[in-house]
């Protein structure tokens, strides 16, 4: 199918979210980029936003409802990871049953209409943007980072220097 690349991308992007979340510690949840500035989301707020916004986009724009509350009962790091892994896994299973007409069908994107493929692409970039913010938070906390799209400074530097790629 022409849109398999989007499904394949989601399959890896959901794992990248979980990988970044796994690099935080439980006591990091309240940390925000600047402790006295509420404009920068805390790690906890980023996890809430990822779970709630992805659930909302999939239900209201893509017509995929996993039938579960978007947030875990206890909002701990491990519970967020478990909830997101389960729900995103169900979404992935549903995406694998789509066909080309489904992707090309028009759907509401806030106050405009777009194809599901267009909306889904925006969802992927939205998630990637927030994952980048969280990766910056890990760097600010002085943590080593696992590879995301290839080698990082933490895994040996630049690709042209044959740095290894290390995934969590």
Residue ranges of each PLM-predicted region?
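Short, contiguous alpha-helical
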Residues: 7, 11-18, 29-72, 109-168
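Membrane-proximal, proline-rich intrinsically disordered regions
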Residues: 24-26
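Acidic catalytic patch
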Residues: 95-110
